[in-house]
């Protein structure tokens, strides 16, 4: 799901920038249509951030409040998440948001609307509804180690598949008939005598047993 895919990023950004993970995830869900919007799919733009005057990266043109508006385009979703945090962190109109506790998602939701992030009057209500429906507030209380352990778990989850594949190859190799090795022949007269003596003893054991 979208939440499972991007929760780690949201928590990482929370500890880097101070933006609540719940707010980041809720905005991502809402703005990107659960990751299925044209901006998200073609431009990795999960937050509907427009170009503005100082943007020097990739661009996409999309009909929003006005026709053919310029939106930022990113090489990856990770860069979209990072830019979203910095967009809020370094713009004066959003500075007051960082006076709220990271767990106060309701104040953050209303503050985003007040600062002009969205024109929809129901924007705060939509964010809060998403946060409470999916219990996104739980991510606001995750320790910093959550992101690292989650990434490690995902890497470990991928390893068994490769291991099973390797074992399968080994089984297929050993399944082929293997020829028995030919008996090693003695290379010297002494070895010949030893073999003959051993053969005679074995014969005697067989005869008198």
Outline where the language-model segments fall.
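LysM (lysin motif) carbohydrate-binding repeats in extracellular/periplasmic proteins that recognize
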Residues: 209
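Catalytic cores of secreted/periplasmic lytic hydrolases that degrade extracellular macromolecules
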Residues: 1-198, 202
